[in-house]
Each structure stands twice: as structure tokens, then as C-alpha cells.
Amino acid sequence: MKLVKLSLVAALAAGAFSAANATPLEEAIKDVDVSGVLRYRYDTGNFDKNFVNNSNLNNSKQDHKYRAQVNFSAAIADNFKAFVQFDYNAADGGYGANGIKNDQKGLFVRQLYLTYTNEDVATSVIAGKQQLNLIWTDNAIDGLVGTGVKVVNNSIDGLTLAAFAVDSFMAAEQGADLLEHSNISTTSNQAPFKVDSVGNLYGAAAVGSYDLAGGQFNPQLWLAYWDQVAFFYAVDAAYSTTIFDGINWTLEGAYLGNSLDSELDDKTHANGNLFALKGSIEVNGWDASLGGLYYGDKEKASTVVIEDQGNLGSLLAGEEIFYTTGSRLNGDTGRNIFGYVTGGYTFNETVRVGADFVYGGTKTEAANHLGGGKKLEAVARVDYKYSPKLNFSAFYSYVNLDQGVNTNESADHSTVRLQALYKF
């Protein structure tokens, strides 16, 4: 009994001491920055009887998808900041036996890292669980997260230097978007690009931004080694300028390649290469672009990115054609050549109405030539910028696989997406 009393007294004393030394709430939150994203999507997709269902395309059935991220960044000591991101990701609705209902899904900690900044040498060290934001990974709100260290230096005007090391990845969040899972199943041993195991990822990058000949020149160089997978390299360069009076012109090109690790250098895998080029123009509310890309191997599985479509959105068009079998950037068998044109008009700098048209094909020597043939996609889209923080958008996409080795008749897939996006 005496021990219990002493323990209780000690606990009360410790509680009193803790309360006396607690940081007042007003002082605790004065250096905390809060930001985040709220996103709602309505998705529905339809496959005709000739189209083999592919989970990388939109197979939603009137699904309501919710995504919320809240970020807290706080200065915790001289030169140190802590960052935590809470994420909510759920989908409800649909019909049939596979209808979705997870409305009670909760928040989880998606990112958690510490940043040390030394202003004297313009260098930051970021350590912890963080979104990678590489050229080979998606840089949007659902990009690949890994645990590691990143060092960023800005001591040279117009040039950012970075080095990174990652020893684990949040693979479950990405599903079929992650390399080695890029097929209708998310089971790695059924993926076109098979990886028995993966090691650490090490890399470096140089990203520049320079005034050149009256325009803006933005070059990038990326190098990375993913143990037991491949040595990756990428070059991207974009030049923007104004010609004549009020005509904005941009030209961007990129090359992404890799050399496979010896463990994957066999008769089923090939080194990956991608060449992409795009030119765009804007004048008096009108915008248009013309581009094309070449990638893949017709006999063996290859990849050009690590996750989803990488950070190559500015060099692509359409919504779903680059997710079709044989054409996936994150691991597939097929040699692909595509060209595209986009255009649109923006009313009062708030509402844009536009369209994309992508046409090309895939040549493959895979079993039964799976994924091969001519392909096209047509997209109609509307975007409404209600305010700097709130945007509404919608698109309708139609994908067609021409009659060929995979279908006795042409196969169609269509999808509709409505979205509301708020950033704060």
C-alpha cells in the first residue's frame, strides 16, 4: 500500500512539474505553418465487350473519391523545422458486387521529416519519411513516398543541386502505379517487368533556371542507382520566350534511359529509353501544342520511370492511353510511337475549354502480341479557376484499340471525371 501511495505522489508531482513547464498554446502554434489539399472526384469508366478490362484504366463505377491532406511545418529550434502530413484517402459508391464503401477510413501520417537549414552555405538536409518528387516519380499529391535523406544546395545562382538516398518505399499506396506492379494485378510476379527484390535508391540532380536570349531556359540532369534494379539517367530541357507581340512559345525535350542491373539483364528484360519532344504556343487566350514520344522494346519488358508516369506530365497528352497494355511507362513490353495535338481557349482567364487527340501504336512480340496494335484517344475537357485556391475541372476520354491481334473488332473504353480541388 505504501508503494502505491508513493507512486501516486510521484505521478502527481511529475504532472505538476510538467504543467508548470508546459509551453503555452499561443506560443506553441505561433511558428506553425498549416497548408494542405482537399480534393473530390467523381469517376466512372466503361469498357465495351471487346476491351479486356485493365485496372490501370479507369474501371470505377460511379465512385466518389475523397482526398484530404493537412500539413504542419514548425520551427522547433534554430535552423530546424519539423514537418508532418496527415492524409485521408477514401472512395465510396459504385454498384454491383464490387461496390466500394469505406466511409469510415481514418487519417494516417503520410510524411514525417526533419529539415536542417544552414543559410551560410544555402544548404538544407531533409531526413525522414517524405515524398520523393524525382523525375521518375509522380510529383502530384499522391506521388511515391520513401524514407531517406535528401540534401539540397542553392549556393549557385540559378542552379539547384540535390543528392538523395532512400532505403524504403510506401509501395502499398501506389499499387499498380509502382514499377514491378504495372499490370491488371498488383502482384509483382505477374507484372510484365518482374523484379525479385529491390535495394536502396541513391541519386543526384542538377536543376537550373536561367535568363537566355530574352527567354527562360530550364535544364535538368538526373542520375540514380536503384540497387538490384537499374542505373537511371535523364535529361530534360525547356525554353520559353515571347515572340512578336504577346505570343508565348515553349519548346521542351527529354531523354530518359536506364541500364539494368546484372540481376535483371536477361532474355525477358531490356534497358529502357524514352525520347519526347513538345512545342506549345499561347496567344490571346488561345493555346495549342504538338508533340510526340518514342519508347519501349518490342521483345522484352522495359521501363522508363519508377512510379506512375513519372514527372513527365508536361510532355504527355490525353488521360488514359499511356496506361493501356503495352504502353505503360512504368514497366511493359512494347515499342511505342505516339504523336499528339492539344488546343483550347481560356475565357476571361478563368474558364478553359480544350481538347486532346493522341494517335499511335504499339508493336510487340509478347505472347499473342498482347498490347500491340494501333491506338487513339480523344479527350474533351473544361477547367474553371474559381479563385487562386479553388479549381473545378471535368473531362471525357474515349480510347480506341484498332482491330488487330488483340481484338476481332475495335475495342473502346470511355471515362468521365469531375473534380473539385482546393489548396490552402
From Swiss-Prot:
GO molecular function: porin activity
Compartment(s) of residence: Cell outer membrane
Keywords: Cell adhesion, Cell outer membrane, Ion transport, Membrane, Porin, Signal, Transmembrane, Transmembrane beta strand, Transport
Cited InterPro entries: Campylo_MOMP
Signal peptide start and end residues: 1-22
GO cellular component, one term: cell outer membrane
Keyword Protein biosynthesis: no
Source domain of life: Bacteria
Broad class of the protein's primary localization: membrane
A biological process term (GO) from this entry: monoatomic ion transport
SUPFAM superfamilies: Porins
Pfam families: Campylo_MOMP
Function of the protein: Assembles to form a functional porin. May be one of the structures responsible for adhesion to intestinal cells.
Quaternary structure annotation from Swiss-Prot or TrEMBL: Homotrimer and monomer.
The name this protein goes by in its record: Major outer membrane protein
